């Protein structure tokens, strides 16, 4: 089976699956209060919780809080789940082995 890579070097279908996962996390009626979005980089996708500004004088920008990172290793074809600590550093999640199926990681989040 041939795997198509996005411009980032990540499998396109897996990236689409992650984007769809994020969009489905919050019902439409609550999207003005909270959203789940993803930031796509060369070798990983970071899932973020987004909240609107809580004070008008802070501007219109929503606050982004990274909650998980899905890292892809092209050589092995495996996805690995990382969690973020209070110091903004990501650590490998030890309770889930890397998987060739990104859905395995999404099911665990």
Segments and roles (model prediction):
Residues 36-40, 67, 90:
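Generic preference for hydrophobic/aromatic residues in regular secondary structure cores
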Residues 46-83:
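Short, conserved beta-strand/beta-arch hydrophobic-aromatic motifs that form part
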């Amino acid at each position: 089976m041939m795997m198509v890579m996005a411009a980032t070097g990540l499998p396109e279908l897996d990236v689409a699956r992650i984007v769809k996962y994020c969009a489905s996390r919050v019902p439409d009626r609550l999207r003005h209060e909270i959203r789940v979005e993803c930031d796509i980089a060369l070798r990983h996708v970071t899932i973020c919780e987004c909240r609107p500004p809580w004070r008008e004088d802070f501007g219109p920008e929503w606050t982004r809080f990274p909650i998980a990172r899905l890292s892809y290793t092209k050589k092995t074809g495996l996805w690995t789940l990382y969690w973020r600590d209070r110091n903004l550093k990501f650590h490998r999640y030890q309770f889930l082995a890397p998987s060739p199926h990104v859905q395995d990681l999404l099911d665990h989040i």
